A protein has these predicted regions:
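N-terminal Lys/Arg-rich, disordered targeting/topogenic segments
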Residues: 1-3
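Solvent-exposed, non-transmembrane regions of membrane-associated and secreted proteins
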Residues: 5-9, 14-205
Length: 205
C-alpha cells in the first residue's frame, strides 16, 4: 500500500512538472504582454500630463542630439559621458522607455527602450545606441532591435510576416510617425553601412 502511494506521488509530480514546462511559454508570454501594455499605458498617461513648454524642450534636446550624430563617424562607439547624455533623452520617468511601436499587420504594440542590452530586449524593443532618436525628419535614421522566437515573450517573433508596403507606427511624446516598409533585408551586425544616415531622408530600420 505504501509503495503504491509513493508511485502515485511520483506520477503526480512528473505530471505537474510536465504541465509546468508545457504551460511556461504561454503563461510567461501573457505575463510579459501584460507588463508591456502597462508600460505603454503609463507612458501615454505621462505624455498627456506634459505641459507644452516641457514637451518642446524634450523634442529640441532630442533633435539637437540627432543633428550631432550627422557629423560623428564614431557615433556607434559611445564614451561614458555620451552614454549618460543619451540615457536622459526622451526618458520621462527614468525607466528607459522613450516611446512605443505599433505594427498593425502583426497586431504588435511594444515599448521602445534605450539601448539593446539583454535586460531591455527581454521585455521591450531596443533603440540602438548611436542611431538617431525617433524624432522623424530629414537626416535621421532610427534603428530598432527586438528578439524573435523567445519562448517567454512574443516581441518581434512574427516580424517575418511583414511585406513591402506594410506600415509601422512610432509614438513618441505628442507625435505619431508612420513609416512604410520599402525593403526587407538582413543586416550583418558588423556591417554598419545599411544603418548610415542620409541627410535628405527619414529612415527607421
Amino acid at each position: 500500500m505504501k509503495k503504491n502511494r509513493i508511485i502515485t506521488v511520483v506520477l503526480i509530480l512528473v505530471f505537474l512538472t510536465g504541465a509546468s514546462l508545457l504551460l511556461y511559454p504561454t503563461v510567461s508570454n501573457l505575463w510579459n504582454s501584460f507588463h508591456q501594455s502597462m508600460a505603454i499605458t503609463e507612458y501615454t498617461e505621462q505624455t498627456e500630463k506634459l505641459d507644452r513648454k516641457t514637451c518642446e524642450r524634450l523634442w529640441a534636446d532630442a533633435e539637437s542630439y540627432n543633428k550631432k550624430l550627422l557629423d560623428n563617424p564614431e557615433r556607434f562607439t559611445m564614451t561614458d559621458e555620451q552614454k549618460t547624455e543619451y540615457d536622459q533623452l526622451l526618458d520621462l520617468s527614468g525607466n528607459g522607455i522613450m516611446g512605443y511601436i505599433e505594427v498593425p499587420a502583426i497586431d504588435c504594440s511594444l515599448p521602445i527602450s534605450h539601448g539593446t542590452d539583454e535586460a531591455a530586449l527581454h521585455t521591450a524593443i531596443g533603440h540602438l545606441e548611436g542611431s538617431s532618436l525617433p524624432t522623424g525628419g530629414k537626416g535621421t535614421h532610427c534603428v530598432l532591435s527586438g528578439h524573435r522566437g523567445l519562448p517567454s515573450a512574443r516581441l518581434f517573433t512574427d516580424l517575418d510576416e511583414l511585406k513591402e508596403g506594410d506600415v509601422f507606427i512610432l509614438k513618441v511624446l505628442d507625435r505619431t510617425m508612420t513609416y512604410e516598409v520599402d525593403q526587407i533585408l538582413t543586416v550583418d551586425p558588423y556591417d554598419l553601412e545599411p544603418l548610415e544616415i542620409d541627410p535628405e531622408m527619414d529612415y527607421c530600420t
